[in-house]
Curated annotation (Swiss-Prot):
It comes from Digitalis lanata. Homodimer. This is 3-oxo-Delta(4,5)-steroid 5-beta-reductase. Keywords: NADP, Nucleotide-binding, Oxidoreductase. It catalyses: 5beta-cholestan-3-one + NADP(+) = cholest-4-en-3-one + NADPH + H(+); 4,5beta-dihydrocortisone + NADP(+) = cortisone + NADPH + H(+). The lineage of its organism: Eukaryota, Viridiplantae, Streptophyta, Embryophyta, Tracheophyta. Signal peptide: none annotated. Involved in cardenolide biosynthesis. Catalyzes the stereospecific conversion of progesterone to 5-beta-pregnane-3,20-dione. Can use progesterone, testosterone, 4-androstene-3,17-dione, cortisol and cortisone as substrates, but not pregnenolone, 21-OH-pregnenolone or isoprogesterone. NADPH could not be replaced by NADH. CDD domains: 5beta-POR_like_SDR_a.
C-alpha cells in the first residue's frame, strides 16, 4: 500500500519500529510547528517506510512541551520559542544535518500590521539559525494560504479581492498581508545558499487534527456538537445562507502534508507556489447533517433572519466543557484551546471562494481527497484521541 493513499482510505500505515534496524537517512526534516494541524500530519507521514525522499529523520519544533496525543510520532521533539532569536539559535543551530525545512506555523495578532511583524520575526529567526549551519540544506517549504488572494481576516468584505477560482499567477493585492512578507523573506534568504530551492503551499479551509491549532475548524465543530449533545440541544447552524447553500471546498491536512513532501523532493515542483485543496466541493447544509449524525444530536437548519454566532452561543461554556471532559474521561483541555469560535464564525459566516488545482496537476501532483470521508475521518480521530466524546 503506497503512503500516497494511506490517509485517503484509512489504511494502516507501516512505521519504523524502535527495534527495527535503523536505516541510513536520506533526508532530514525540520518541521516548524509540529503540533499544529499540518505539522502533526507531517510528523505522521514523513517517518513512514515508503515516504518519497526517505528514509527520513525528523526534527519537530514547537513552543510548548510535547503533548501526550503527539507522543506516538517517531520524531525528535525540539521545544523552542522561535519568536526568541536566542532560543532559536541555541536550539536550532546545532541541528546541522537538516536537509529540508517545512515551515507550517504562524502567530495570530490583533492587527495585520502586528501579524506581519510577529510572523516575519519568527521566520527570520528560524532561517538565520538553519541556513548558515546546515551544509546539506536543500529545500524550504513554506505554508501560507488562500488569504493570499483574499486579504487578511480583518479586511474580509472591506477590500476588493480577486475573482475566483483563484490561480497562482494572480497578482498580489495592494494591501498588507503577512503571507507576502514571508514569501519575500524566503526568496531573499534562499539567495544566500547556492542550490537551495523553495516551494509555497496555499491551502484553503483545513480539515485535520490538532488540539493546538489556532484554525482547527473540524475540532471546533466537534466541540460545539459535543456541548449541544450534553445539553440536549439542537445543533443550530451558525453561519450565513451563502455558506449553507453555496459550494465550499477544503484542504485535508494529510493531503497538504503530501503536497509539501512532493514539492520538496520532485525536481519539477521546485521554486513554485501552489494551491492545495481536495479537488471536490460540498455544501455545509449536507455536512451539517453528517456532523449531527456523528454526535447523535438533532440537526438544525439555516435560520433566516437570525444572526447566530458560535462566539455568542458558546460564551460561558467553560464549566460545561470541564464537566464533559470529566464525565467522559477525555484528555484534559481548555475550551479556549479546542473551541476556536471566532474562526468558525469567519468560515461559516462568509461565502467560500474556490481555488484551482490545475497548476499542481500540471506539475505532477495528482493527490486528492473525498471531502465527506475526510470530514468523518477527522471527527473519528478527535474521538480516538479523546478530545471529544
Amino acid at each position: 500500500m503506497s503512503w500516497w493513499w494511506a490517509g485517503a482510505i484509512g489504511a494502516a500505515k507501516k512505521r519504523l519500529e524502535e527495534d527495527d534496524a535503523q536505516p541510513k537517512h536520506s533526508s532530514v526534516a525540520l518541521i516548524v510547528g509540529v503540533t499544529g494541524i499540518i505539522g502533526n500530519s507531517l510528523a505522521e507521514i514523513l517517518p513512514l517506510a515508503d515516504t518519497p525522499g526517505g528514509p527520513w529523520k525528523v526534527y519537530g519544533v514547537a513552543r510548548r512541551t510535547r503533548p501526550a496525543w503527539h507522543e506516538d510520532n517517531p520524531i525528535n521533539y525540539v521545544q523552542c520559542d522561535i519568536s526568541d532569536p536566542d532560543d532559536s539559535q541555541a536550539k536550532l543551530s546545532p541541528l546541522t544535518d537538516v536537509t529540508h525545512v517545512f515551515y507550517v506555523t504562524w502567530a495570530n495578532r490583533s492587527t495585520e500590521q502586528e501579524n506581519c511583524e510577529a510572523n516575519s520575526k519568527m521566520f527570520r529567526n528560524v532561517l538565520d539559525a538553519v541556513i548558515p549551519n546546515c551544509p546539506n540544506l536543500k529545500h524550504i517549504s513554506l505554508q501560507t494560504g488562500r488569504k493570499h488572494y483574499m486579504g487578511p481576516f480583518e479586511s474580509y468584505g472591506k477590500i476588493e479581492s480577486h475573482d475566483p477560482p483563484y490561480t497562482e499567477d494572480l497578482p498580489r493585492l495592494k494591501y498588507m498581508n503577512f503571507y507576502y512578507d514571508l514569501e519575500d523573506i524566503m526568496l531573499e534568504e534562499v539567495e544566500k545558499k547556492e542550490g537551495l530551492t523553495w516551494s509555497v503551499h496555499r491551502p484553503g479551509n483545513i480539515f485535520g487534527f490538532s488540539p493546538y491549532s489556532m484554525m482547527n475548524l473540524v475540532g471546533t465543530l466537534c466541540v460545539y456538537a459535543a456541548i449541544c449533545k450534553h445539553e440536549g440541544k439542537v445543533l443550530r447552524f451558525t453561519g450565513c445562507k451563502a455558506a449553507w447553500d453555496g459550494y465550499s471546498d477544503c484542504s485535508d491536512a494529510d493531503l497538504i502534508a503530501e503536497h509539501h513532501i512532493w514539492a520538496a523532493v520532485d525536481p519539477y515542483a521546485k521554486n513554485e507556489a501552489f494551491n492545495v485543496s481536495n479537488g471536490d466541493v460540498f455544501k455545509w447544509k449536507h455536512f451539517w447533517k453528517v456532523l449531527a449524525e456523528q454526535f447523535g444530536v438533532g440537526c438544525g437548519e439555516y435560520e433566516e433572519g437570525v444572526d447566530l454566532k458560535l462566539q455568542d452561543l458558546m460564551k460561558g461554556k467553560e464549566p460545561v466543557w470541564e464537566e464533559i471532559v470529566r464525565e467522559n474521561g477525555l484528555t484534559p483541555t481548555k475550551l479556549k484551546d479546542v473551541g476556536i469560535w471566532w474562526f468558525g464564525d469567519v468560515i461559516l459566516g462568509n461565502e467560500c471562494f474556490l481555488d484551482s488545482m490545475n497548476k499542481s496537476k500540471e506539475h505532477g501532483f495528482l493527490g486528492f481527497r473525498n471531502s465527506k470521508n475526510a470530514f468523518i475521518s477527522w471527527i473519528d480521530k478527535a474521538k480516538a484521541y479523546k478530545i471529544v466524546p
